[in-house]
Amino acid sequence: MTPFLNSLYHSNSTLAFSNVFNQVKAGKTSDAETMIETGLFGLNQGSFMVNYGGTNTQQAAPFILSKNGGYTSAVFHGNTGSFWNRNTAYKQWGYNYFFDASYFTKQDDTN
């Protein structure tokens, strides 16, 4: 995966910026996900994913890639699916599969 991402970054048709300012708001990581997937900014109050993620249709990357390129998409997150309303928002964004904390095996020993 990294060689592919590197090729996108170094392509002459790619715009890349080295001086970027943090735009997340009250939604924290959910705002970052919203911006990456949809291009929309976070809300001043609350989380976009919580307030609008399950009720509105957004033109998100997974949906666009599925519709225009036939891609199947999956998303992985180590927290519960209901946290920041991810279980609903990810479906609205067009993800085919969502693997949350219940999918992963938890280990007490991290060594």
Which residues make up each language-model segment?
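Active-site-proximal alpha/beta segments of enzymes that process anionic O-linked groups
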Residues: 2-111
